[in-house]
Amino acid sequence: MKRSMYAGRVREEHIGQEITLKGWVGRRRDLGGLIFIDLRDREGIMQLVINPEKVSAEVMATAESLRSEFVIEVTGQVAAREQANDKLPTGAVELNVTALIVLNTAKTTPFEIKDGIEANDDTRLRYRYLDLRRPEMLENLKLRAKVTHSIRNYLDELEFIDVETPFLSKSTPEGARDYLVPSRVNKGHFYALPQSPQITKQLLMNAGFDRYYQIVKCFRDEDLRGDRQPEFTQVDLETSFLTEQEIQDITEGLIARVMKETKDIEVTLPFPRMKYDDAMALYGSDKPDTRFDMLLQDLTEVVKGVDFKVFSEALAVKAIVVKGAADNYSRKDIDKMTEVAKQYGAKGLAWVKVVDGELNGPVAKFLTGIQEELTTALALEDKDLVLFVADTLEVANATLGALRGRIAKELGLIDNDKFNFLWVVDWPMFEWSEEEGRYMSAHHPFTLPQEETAHELEGDLAKVRAIAYDIVLNGYELGGGSLRINQKDLQERMFKALGFSAEEANDQFGFLLEAMDYGFPPHGGLAIGLDRFVMLLAGEENIREVIAFPKNNKATDPMTQAPSTVALKQLEELSLQVEEDETSKTN
């Protein structure tokens, strides 16, 4: 029998109609000789009523055999419920069943198919096809589909061209580790799965496409956390002949369209802009959450003369004031925060509380001589808690930035209904890597330096600034972009500044340098992390909740058991041999 409609779309207007529905048994209840079934499909739940006086004995017997997650087909007449259920869109109606067919049976599921379950993450991923039956997961993925639909429509209207770029590409040394794919035909050679389509989209600009976009999978072999996956999706854009401002305007329009069409929220344009240095100084983060205050305060000069060497001899002393929170945090609580501070490189965490107009705490005695100045500088009031970090400027900023976010969550200072977008601009071109012992690209080596600082490519790399811009939402980096280098000599200087010899640069990027001999236009672009964007729109805290089949935090798939070993014959075809580690040898 042909399905008449989705179960979740039956309404009062259908009363009196005979319809056929198909779906899963959510719940079965026997009451006063009647059997009630909650039939579930992707659009919602519909109540079925099976009355022994109105159906055959065969239908009744079938109804009595039903269990959760059986797949069924039912035909019957839509009727008004005696008592409506206001919690369901279908709550005013029910279906009086006249025919019932079991399309498939089901074993008892490892967890209930409902929202708010307490199953652990690996169990949910092991049975992801069951987890995805839950309404909240289904709604998350429907939201994702709406977002991509909105994005495509917007970019199509602006005459962007959707172009697919290769997944089997060349490994390059900058950025995160590549996922490598061995070549059977070219033994000893490897493809890399792209971390982004960066170079290929730039080459499309050289080819004259002018405006390119792609909603594309990217791959990075890096340590995982709540907002990262080894394979992720980004909305990738590139344009020719546009300024930084024009690219940002297009991006803001895209986000405004998505927010309106998926959340019915009107966002204010243009988005605020904040310089990188200001973001670090005031928020301790290059992706500041501006939904709450608690800004970082620089006290380096204020505490210079105190008789406390930790402060007076520190390169930087910074603080945050947690308003009215003195009673919220015990010594034990602050000790826990001190451990967090140490994770960010700080040697410790100093603190005072304002009690009856006086400073109290372990370092209060060193601050009595500057109490008035400190009170004015920090606008202190009774019951305030002040947290200090004395260290390098970088460590002080990072530590207090992390504590700021943690405390705001603990005290409920964040309005979760707010969507605060902003641009972080005027980025450093390079950042120092302690692990590598050298400067590395803050974004990537194709970013155009600001003209007035480009001469420092042969001088102090810390002074080189990039024409780069990140878009931030509620403390998350939503995406980033830049204008790109289109002059060969400047690109060669950039590679040299990063430590590449001419031979190494040519080996890794010779095809790009060659392309710059053929009229490469000025160009720039941006990429938005789709998974992260949808996560924030859905109010989730982990991007796994908006990806159909994600990996766990060990980069494995508990359902398919990927990654897995492969047959020896497959390895031989690729001229590969797997070395056993010492643990394997002893087991």
Curated annotation (Swiss-Prot):
Q: What class of enzyme is it?
A: ligase
Protein EC = 6.1.1.12
Query: Could you tell me the superkingdom of the organism this chain comes from?
Result: Bacteria
What does the record list as GO biological process? aspartyl-tRNA aminoacylation
Query: What is any one of the record's Gene Ontology cellular component terms?
Result: cytoplasm
Q: Which family does it belong to?
A: Belongs to the class-II aminoacyl-tRNA synthetase family. Type 1 subfamily.
Assembly, in brief, is:
Homodimer.
What function is annotated for this protein? Answer: Catalyzes the attachment of L-aspartate to tRNA(Asp) in a two-step reaction: L-aspartate is first activated by ATP to form Asp-AMP and then transferred to the acceptor end of tRNA(Asp).
Q: Know the name of this protein?
A: Aspartate--tRNA ligase
Q: Which organism is it from?
A: Streptococcus pneumoniae serotype 2 (strain D39 / NCTC 7466)
